From Swiss-Prot:
It comes from Rattus norvegicus. Composed of 4 alpha helices: 2 hydrophobic transmembrane regions (alpha3 and alpha4) and 2 alpha helices (alpha1 and alpha2). Alpha1 and alpha2 feature one hydrophobic side and a hydrophilic side. In contrast to NINJ1, does not disrupt membrane integrity. NINJ2 filaments are curved toward the intracellular space due to cholesterol-binding, preventing circularization and ability to mediate plasma membrane rupture. Residues 1-62, 129-144 are extracellular. This is Ninjurin-2. Keywords: Cell adhesion, Cell membrane, Membrane, Transmembrane, Transmembrane helix. GO terms for molecular function: cholesterol binding.
Amino acid sequence: MESDREIIHLQHRHSTPGGNQRHINLNHYATKKSVAESMLDVALFMSNAMRLKSVLEQGPFSQYYTTLLTLISASLLLQVVIGILLVVIARLNLNEVENQWRLNQLNNAATTLVFITVVINIFITAFGAHKTGSVAARTSSNPI
């Protein structure tokens, strides 16, 4: 063995149409997947920050102010935790046996938190953080 650590090479042989075989490094794939998920997390984070701004601008007298403030804050907090988990997952080497159990647990935790975040965001959308049309005009603090 090359080192004191046991390493499993997680490579998959993939046949191309010409019959050639190439190796797919699953650790590289997992890292790219984590980076892509992090980018989506950033987009959702920005969206929720804008929703939070909208709720705060409407003020505490809006119908669902406390509910939306709580849901958006919980979603933002979960997204930060998910982002940290994804960075940790991307930094650990899947090829090292001693990391595989930990990576599996971290991946399960991240997946669970993403599911909870999606459910929270469904409720945020249902309660609505944006007023439109004549309702917004009537409740605006800057009359026309």
